[in-house]
């Protein structure tokens, strides 16, 4: 009887030795749980409001140990008496993922703004200077909110969460594993 228990336990443990999070799962988590709207400046003088409209995550593609977050954003910009301008911005952030064992959450650290364009074209310097603080706040927000969280109600995720796992990037997935 005890041998049967050990066999079943080892099969379960072997199946739970790691948990992978795909790019799509992380993208879906961000869409469902995180929203970004930032504004800077003084309205009717120099003002910008930036809202993220779409996010996509790429894991370990451009840099083996980093996660890239692509954000399509809309920026409404007003400079002095000129009419408001609407800009469709493409942002790319990259960051190192970090797993918090206490909460079962994945956070992004060492965030870098890699790309900052409007439809693939660099922005004029005056507009870039005005919008950059709001864009930086989006990057800051990405570092403060989890980009993925293990679900305590799913057995495999609960078992991984209760241990002290490592986080690695493998095959364009975040892999939370119990053993090196």
Feature names for model-found ranges:
Residues 1:
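Electrostatic, structured charged patches in enzyme active sites and in nucleic-acid/phosphate-binding
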Residues 16-180:
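Extracellular/lumenal and peripheral-membrane lipid-interaction modules
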Residues 4-14:
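Bacterial N-terminal signal peptides
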